[in-house]
A protein has these predicted regions:
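Secretory targeting and sorting signals
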Residues: 1-39
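C-terminal region of N-terminal signal peptides and the immediate post-cleavage residues
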Residues: 28-56
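Signal-peptide-cleaved, periplasmic/extracellular N-terminal interaction regions immediately downstream
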Residues: 49-208
Length: 208
């Protein structure tokens, strides 16, 4: 025998069915792809080329501390040695009567020409300067006779120079010792003749 459901029971079933439908609809919406405006793709990082640049050199100086040499002999003779202070470096100048041809400037121990005796210098580094020109003329007479061979120039108060010494002149070449505060960058160049005199210039920077 089939019993008809009561109105209250039927209404409860309808409400339950409606609630179930709403839940299913919401669930379906949660998993369905959104039809809203498309999401803009994430911004890609802009490629930036970073160049590795060295620190700005002191006073723009790009010298080094390796030997600087030039070959050649001449009849020029050495007549004087001078020194001066500049904003970024100390300068040594060798005056020659005639054209400078060859030289060798490097950080190395200094020895006397002829005897080979070691020449001690003030400072933490020794710069040896050899010029292929004598300090005497063709008759063997000295063209450069400093009062104190071990102190050619008073460099008191210089930031880099500590001592300039004459190590001798023998067999057509002359050697000088330049004592400096530390092994610092330097440059060597020749100034053209003026009044028959050329100049060999050695600049040593105050720091790296």
């Amino acid at each position: 025998m089939t019993l008809d459901p009561s109105p209250r029971s039927t209404r409860r079933q309808r409400l339950h069915a409606a609630a179930t439908a709403v839940v299913l609809a919401c669930s379906a919406g949660a998993f369905a792809p959104a039809s809203a405006a498309p999401v803009a793709p994430a911004a890609q990082p802009t490629a930036v080329t970073t160049a590795t640049t060295a620190a700005t050199p002191y006073c723009g100086i790009r010298w080094g501390s390796l030997p600087e040499t030039r070959s050649g002999y001449s009849s020029a003779t050495i007549h004087n040695v001078r020194a001066g202070r500049h904003a970024c470096f100390d300068r040594m100048v060798i005056d020659l009567k005639g054209q400078v041809r060859g030289y060798d400037v490097r950080y190395a121990p200094v020895y006397r020409e002829g005897s080979g005796a070691f020449v001690p210098l003030l400072g933490a580094a020794d710069l040896r300067i050899t010029v292929t020109a004598p300090a005497y003329d063709q008759d063997g007479r000295a063209t450069y006779t400093p009062r104190s061979p071990n102190r050619l120039v008073d460099v008191t108060g210089y930031r880099t120079f500590r001592q300039i010494a004459l190590a001798g002149s023998f067999e057509g070449q002359t050697t000088f010792g330049l004592g400096v505060r530390a092994r610092l960058p330097f440059r060597t160049f020749v100034l053209p003749q003026s009044g028959g005199v050329s100049r060999l210039v050695i600049d040593v920077a105050h720091r790296w």
